[in-house]
């Protein structure tokens, strides 16, 4: 940078002087030998215009014209002439190319004479085809006449075919009718399930709305809680500031006022006025007020007595009305409870009737009567086995409990006997005698405990539980668990039962087809 500044200080202008550049090269090739850049051939001087079949009109001395170079005079004149403005030279790595910018092509107007000439070449002659080999006839020809009906009887042969065709057509028509009815039933069934789905969708939307309301309520409560906490924080700050201010100023104010009062600069004019003027007047007024109070108390006592009597009378009347109202309400509640019980009983009976309807009354039946009876017998046997098992378990539990109690009582009696034996031995030792050889007996009224007898008595006292009644609900659940009845079969049977005579299975044609 220092060298550049020193270089700039040598000249009065800012730009550094440079050597003059030569615009022309020191050696230039002949213009006739230079290759022209690629351009549009429609405007190239070297391309002949006109029809290519026409004769070209060349100059008298074409060779001289081609080899003739530019004269020095023309070259000098061209160099001295002012050059027209042209496109700047291309940058390094690029070049300028002439392109066509005209809208239409040039029309060729030269007409070339034309003439038609034809010639015919004879086709090659092919070898004639080889004649077919026909062997010489051997043997004797015979002729047989076949009359109509000899080989094929149309009326006899077409009858079974016609019967088959007519039967197939009728069967196909019947199948199409049954298929249409089945499609109608399936469409109705689908619409029913669509209604159920829409109802479930509405319920889902209702639950989503409830959940959304809960979330909004939760957010609102949380916002309220945050606001409450903020208000409490502000209040605590204010209370703390107020307490600090009171604690800081209380001592100062009290000290200042005590000093002023003790010095005599401050006195209470109200106190002086009260002592001199107000207290005597107050005494007189108090005496008069007390006298009026005695009279007022007497009047109030009389009014209170009258009001108490009226209140007692009103209370008795209201108590009677309340008792009658309570009786009416109790009667109404009893009627409502009775009606609700009847309604629940009807609903329970309807629920109990549904399995009976599905198993025994639904047409077509989802299961045979023998299968239902077999399932009922199996469930009854299972119920009896369960009752017996429960009875055995109850007896075992009662026996275990009775055995434990009897063994505990036996242990107590054994301990009592040991205690009596020890007491008798101690008394004999005090008397200087030997202990009695016979074991002591139980006190009067105390019977020895027999564990096995108590256990047997407890087992005999256990009642046998009743066998659970087998209902149609149990039978239906049992058969569905075993796979004897499926949900699809029940739904299809209900749909057919609901359609009645409209169902394809109840159609007489379907019944005849099944019988066939």
From Swiss-Prot:
- Name the record gives this protein: Flagellar radial spoke protein 3
An example GO biological process term is: positive regulation of cilium-dependent cell motility
Which Pfam families does the annotation name? Radial_spoke_3
Its annotated function is as follows:
Protein 3 may attach the radial spoke to the outer doublet microtubule or is required to form a stable spoke structure. Flagellar radial spokes contribute to the regulation of dynein arm activity and thus the pattern of flagellar bending. They consist of a thin stalk, which is attached to the a subfiber of the outer doublet microtubule, and a bulbous head, which is attached to the stalk and appears to interact with the projections from the central pair of microtubules.
| Coiled-coil region(s) | none
Q: Which InterPro entries match?
A: Radial_spoke_3
Q: Which UniProt keywords apply?
A: Cell projection, Cilium, Cytoplasm, Cytoskeleton, Flagellum, Phosphoprotein
Which PANTHER family does this UniProt record tie to the protein?
FLAGELLAR RADIAL SPOKE PROTEIN 3, RADIAL SPOKE HEAD PROTEIN 3 HOMOLOG
Q: Look up and give the organism this protein is from.
A: Chlamydomonas reinhardtii (Chlamydomonas smithii)
What happens to this protein after translation, modification-wise?
Answer: Protein 3 is one of the 5 radial spoke proteins that are phosphorylated. Protein 3a might only differ from protein 3 in being unphosphorylated.
Q: What is annotated about its quaternary structure and interactions? A: Interacts with FAP91.
Compositional bias segments (type: Polar residues):
1-11, 62-74
Q: Where in the cell is it found?
A: Cytoplasm, Cytoskeleton, Flagellum axoneme
The entry assigns this protein to a family as follows: Belongs to the flagellar radial spoke RSP3 family.
